[in-house]
Swiss-Prot record:
It comes from Stenotrophomonas maltophilia (strain R551-3). GO terms for molecular function: 2-C-methyl-D-erythritol 4-phosphate cytidylyltransferase activity. Belongs to the IspD/TarI cytidylyltransferase family. IspD subfamily. It holds the Pfam family IspD. Pathway: Isoprenoid biosynthesis; isopentenyl diphosphate biosynthesis via DXP pathway; isopentenyl diphosphate from 1-deoxy-D-xylulose 5-phosphate: step 2/6. This is 2-C-methyl-D-erythritol 4-phosphate cytidylyltransferase. The record marks 157, 213 as: Positions MEP for the nucleophilic attack. Catalyzes the formation of 4-diphosphocytidyl-2-C-methyl-D-erythritol from CTP and 2-C-methyl-D-erythritol 4-phosphate (MEP). The keyword ATP-binding does not apply. The record marks 17, 24 as: Transition state stabilizer. Keywords: Isoprene biosynthesis, Nucleotidyltransferase, Transferase.
Amino acid sequence: MSAAIWVVVPAAGRGARFGAPMPKQYLQAGGQILLAHTLDALLAHPAVAGAMVVIGPDDADWPGWSEWAGKPVLTCIGGATRAASVLAGLQALPETVRADEFVLVHDAARPNLSPADLGRLLEVGRADPVGAILAAPVRDTLKRAGDDGGIDGTEPRERLWRALTPQLFRRHQLSRALSEAATAGVEVTDEAMAMERQGQRPLLVEGSEDNFKVTTPADLDRFEFVLSRRAG
């Protein structure tokens, strides 16, 4: 079997768009916080060795876990942006994680990752020299808006995908890509964007639409419905 993989989970965001009194990754669903569901999904896979959870400097809600599902859970302090937090997590990984080893990055508030999706990503991504991301083809019709709010045109969607997580890259390549983007003053919105700036072409691995990010109260309601259906 290939070397075990660590996952970096950026959880330093405050979730301001959600409007809750605490970061959304700490909201309850089905008897435990969202972050617990996320760790369940990640650490259940036999290839995942442990998790580096990146938290905010004033995070009073972090439960203080040191292990989950019998695997180590480490923490470090993140930065002002997602990219800065991911970079901090990569730098804080144990020394046993070599520079050329693949590392996963997964959103803390994306708790409904399926074992099948994670397995496909690992299988495809580790066979590629660059890596891969989970993504979903765009199925809705896309409109381009003008400054006045009117429609300026309809965009072709045939080759458009929505980026999901996890995303899988080699530790040193992703660290360099994120660092160079920060030096250039470029705000990257996911890890693949940083790699693209390096001239790399990560693979797209189709993932389930159920692997959604909890961003609004409606998303939380949707996840609770999923949990209720799963419980029977």
